[in-house]
């Protein structure tokens, strides 16, 4: 299997046209799967500078040095990395008054210099504004997150058009919160409207909400859940691998039980 990360690519921007579709959840889970299933060194960054909650979703409630600090001051980007118990390296965001102070070209240069990471995931701000453009400019390729409803699919077209304008490839679409109801937009219709391949369909799974409450990735908290399996397969796809059956995740989660 050929993976996504080739020809020097290692920075994936996870983007969407609107909030609440599951970008942060996707970043955390495919990152955690890569770090633990495939023993990859993974860095996840919150580039949603005005309302990011990547750190909060992992229980990082206090982070004096954030992405904004390293872009504003001449600090090494590694100074802001939080080493999480899941094996993920995390750079959270903080509220800033003016996103124009962030130089996405400089950010990409800094990220490219981190040769010790196999995969870098950017949790983007939603929409097509200046804050959302940070991830697009810094990424090598993009994952577009949608939910199977017409308003979300319609607005996703704007994100695709922006990516084309900025000459950033969109690897494919992740359909999140799938319930397989008659009122949902079908996979075939989403592919037709957006003109992009569907690389994953993630079910609307109770395990995601339980894991979020525990401040843990679902792939570790509930490894056998349907959504967790979808995220593990997506992570495997990134590296051109297959998900192997076994007890690794079952054993690993015991280390996090309270």
Regions found by a protein language model. Give the residues of each.
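Solvent-exposed alpha-helical segments within well-ordered globular domains of core cellular machineries
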Residues: 32, 68-69, 79, 105, ...
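Short, well-ordered alpha-helices that flank and scaffold nucleotide-derived cofactor binding pockets
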Residues: 28, 32-36, 137, 158-161, ...
């Amino acid at each position: 299997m050929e993976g996504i990360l080739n020809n020097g690519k290692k920075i994936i921007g996870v983007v969407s046209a609107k909030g609440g579709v599951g970008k942060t959840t996707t970043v955390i889970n495919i990152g955690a799967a890569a770090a633990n299933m495939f023993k990859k060194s993974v860095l996840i960054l919150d580039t949603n500078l005005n309302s990011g909650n990547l750190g909060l979703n992992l229980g990082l409630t206090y982070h004096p040095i954030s992405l904004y600090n390293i872009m504003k001051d001449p600090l090494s980007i590694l100074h802001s990395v939080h080493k999480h118990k899941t094996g993920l390296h995390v750079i959270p965001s903080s509220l800033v008054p003016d996103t124009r102070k962030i130089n996405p070209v400089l950010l990409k240069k800094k990220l490219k210099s981190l040769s010790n990471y196999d995969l870098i995931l950017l949790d983007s701000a939603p929409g097509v504004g200046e804050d959302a453009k940070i991830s697009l400019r810094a990424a090598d390729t993009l994952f577009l997150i949608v939910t199977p409803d017409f308003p979300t699919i319609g607005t996703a077209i704007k994100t695709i058009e922006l990516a084309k304008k900025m000459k950033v490839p969109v690897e494919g679409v992740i359909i999140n919160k799938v319930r397989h109801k008659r009122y949902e937009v079908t996979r075939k219709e989403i592919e037709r409207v957006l003109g992009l391949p569907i690389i994953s369909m993630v079910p609307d799974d109770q395990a995601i909400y339980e894991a979020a409450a525990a401040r843990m990735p679902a792939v570790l908290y509930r490894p056998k859940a349907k959504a967790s399996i979808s995220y593990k397969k997506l992570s495997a796809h990134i590296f051109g691998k297959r998900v192997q059956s076994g007890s690794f995740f079952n054993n690993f989660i015991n280390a996090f039980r309270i």
